[in-house]
């Protein structure tokens, strides 16, 4: 057996243990006990985003880290956004753009999802520098001597902030294991590898595997969770957002140093939705189809 096949065989009853939704891109989200999942991900996840009125383009925490200090919760009609000072506003308030611009100290406007055909809405805004490598290093939080993530397979994201018609980074569902977080914590006890830094939709428990990042063994596999079927598309290359401070988490660039040093800058996996359905906490996870090509280095980005 290959390392990948052996690792999958060693997994004992993987289970969904936490479920998260982020109603506004790059803001803090909410915990769920159950949810519906469509082909575009968890219902209501990343359904809104801010547009940079100074440089253009939809913006997330990579460019506007202050976004991560705001929280968004699903309301009856639209999300309610809460600032660190306790003030809140509904996403459809007449004054929401001015309110957000004040809280972020940057001119922005808030937008629901627009149709995918409106490409200009999703096109990237002006870069901070004309030096493309420097721009990538800044976005991904990489030092000059650290490798930049391999973005082959993500070419669309060089032109657009997100796949047109969506506000997620690359794929509609992100997954992380409790074991990956615990492993990173053990490698550097000074760093807080808190799940909130990594913003997964699904946090799962994968007992039995000795792999430090067991979910990465599933890249290329098809899984069932509840009545949902997911295709695991790639590992998740991490960006500078994981290092920013918000809520009770301090700014900590050592998070990225550890990710680069121990997991090639990746943590968690991305999935597409092959069959819509519903998810609940404690749902069992089943491998329906193994990766077609065994991958002995499962934390490579494809």
Q: Which ranges hold each PLM region?
A:
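Metal-cofactor-dependent catalytic cores
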Residues: 2-302
């Amino acid at each position: 057996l290959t390392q990948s096949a052996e690792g999958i065989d060693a997994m004992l009853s993987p289970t969904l243990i936490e479920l998260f939704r982020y109603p506004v891109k790059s803001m803090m989200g909410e915990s769920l006990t159950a949810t519906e999942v469509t082909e575009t991900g968890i219902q209501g996840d990343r359904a809104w985003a801010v547009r940079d009125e100074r440089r253009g383009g939809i913006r997330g925490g990579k460019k506007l880290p202050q976004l991560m200090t705001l929280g968004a919760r699903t309301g009856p009609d639209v999300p309610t956004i809460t600032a660190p000072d306790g003030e809140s506003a509904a996403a459809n308030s007449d004054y929401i753009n001015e309110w957000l611009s004040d809280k972020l100290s940057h001119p922005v406007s808030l937008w629901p999802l627009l149709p995918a055909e409106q490409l200009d809405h999703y096109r990237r805004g002006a870069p901070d520098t004309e030096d493309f490598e420097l721009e990538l290093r800044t976005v991904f939080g990489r030092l000059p001597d650290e490798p930049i993530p391999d973005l082959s397979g993500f070419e669309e994201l060089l032109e657009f902030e997100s796949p047109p018609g969506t506000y997620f980074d690359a794929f509609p569902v992100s997954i992380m294991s409790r074991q990956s977080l615990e492993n990173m914590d053990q490698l550097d006890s000074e760093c807080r590898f808190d799940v909130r830094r990594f913003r997964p939709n699904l946090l799962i428990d994968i007992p039995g595997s000795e792999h430090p990042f067991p979910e990465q063994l599933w890249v290329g596999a098809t899984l069932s969770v509840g009545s949902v079927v997911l295709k695991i598309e790639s590992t998740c290359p991490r960006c500078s957002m994981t290092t920013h401070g918000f809520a009770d988490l301090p700014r900590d660039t050592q998070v990225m140093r550890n990710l680069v040093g121990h997991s090639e800058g990746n943590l968690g996996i991305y999935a597409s939705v092959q069959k819509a359905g519903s998810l609940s906490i404690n749902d069992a996870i089943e491998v329906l189809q193994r990766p077609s090509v065994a991958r002995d280095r499962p934390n490579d980005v494809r």
